[in-house]
Amino acid sequence: MDIVSRRIGRRSVLGGAAAVAAGSLVYPARGTFAASEQPVKIGMVDPQTGTFAAEGASEIIGAKLALDQINKAGGILGRPVELLIEDSASDPGLAVTKARKLVGSDKVNFLMGSVSSAVSLSLNQAADELKTLYVDTGGHTDQVTGTECRWTTFRTCSTTWMLTAGNFKTLFDKFGKNWYFLTPDYAYGHSLAKDYSKQLAKAGGKVLGNTLSPLGTTDFSSYLIKIREVKPDVMVNLTAGNDLVNSMKQAVQFGMEKEMTIAGAQIELEDLAAMPKEARLGWWVMEWYWDQPNQPHVADFVATYKTMAGGKPPSARSWFGFASLHAITMAANKAKALDTLSVVKAMEGLVLPPEIALQPNNPFYRAADHQMIANEFPGYVLSDGQYPNLFHVADIVPGTTIALSPAEDGCKMTYPT
C-alpha cells in the first residue's frame, strides 16, 4: 500500500478530493519562512481508499485548509508546518505500520487522523508506545478516551455515548420502545449498540435483536429480511460509510420504511450525498453542520473550504481535520516546545476560539480524559432536499449536558514519571 511520497503544489491542492488519491502524500509548508527553518512535521493517517474513503478525503481537505491558515500566521514556534498524509485503508494493522513509518523514518512531531474506531484504538496504543501525541480526528468508540485512554491521545470527534444520547429521547418518544439494531461488527458499532441499549433499558424499552454485519458488506438482504420478520418499532441502523449507503438503499427497496421507523446515531453529509433520493430518510445526529446562519465565522469557513474542495461544502469530517490541526498548533505554541509531554499538558483544557470552533458553547478538550466536549446536532434527513441541503438540524445539544464523566467512561489517565 505504500506509494512513493510526492509533493502537492497549489494547483493540485485546489483539486480537492482528487489530491488525496495517492496513498502517501506530503503537503508542503506555505508562507514566508527562512530557507534554513526546519519544518515541524505532522503525520496524518486517514483512509483514502475503502469503505470510509469519502470521509477521509473530507478530513484531509479540512486539515489542509487549517495548514494554509497556520503557515500564513507563522507556523509553529516560527517554523513552517508540513503535513504528511498516509492511507490507512481503514486497516488497523496497516495504520500502525504507517504511523511507525511517519515517526521513525519521516520524523514527524505529531500524529492525527482516523475514521474507523478500530484504527483509532490501534493508533492510540501505537502512539503511546512511540511516545508521540496523537489526535484521533474521527474514530468514535467510547474506549479511546474511556477504558483505553492514554496520555498521548486526544480526540476531536464525539464518543459513541454522546452520539446516542444526542437523539435517544427523540427516537424513543416519537417512534416506540421496541428496537432492533443493524450493527457493523467492529468497535464503533459495538459501542453504539451498547450505549443505545443501556439508555433503552433504563427507559423501559426492549432490544428485539442485534444483527452484526462485517465491515464492507455490500449485500444486506439476509440481515434486513431477519429484521423485517421481527417487526420492531425502530430499526436502528448503526452502519457507516459505504455500508450505510448500501443498507439504506436495500432497506428502501424492501419497503421497510413503510413498516417501521428507520433511524440511527451518526449520519454524515458524505453518505447522504451518495444515497439515492428515496434512501434519504430518518432521524440521526450530525456532529457539525455547515449551515449555521447565526454562528460567526462559519460562512467564511464554508466559502474558503469550497475553493479547496471543488465547490463541495464542508462536513463534520472536514471540521474534525480542520480543528484537530489547529488544536495541535495552538498547544505547541502555548507550550513553546515540541516535546510530547509539554504539548500534551498545553492541550489539556484547551478551548477552541470561535474562528476554529465554528459552533456555539465553546468546545474544549477535557483535561481528565482528553475528550473534546463540543455539540451534537440531532435532526432529520430532508428527503426532498437538494445537495447539500439534506439535513434539518432540530436542536443543538451541548456536549456538557450529555457526556459521561471520565470516571463513568472508565478513564484512568497515567503519565510517564
What is the role of each PLM region?
Residues 2-9, 14-16, 23-29, 33-417:
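Extracytosolic ligand-binding ectodomains
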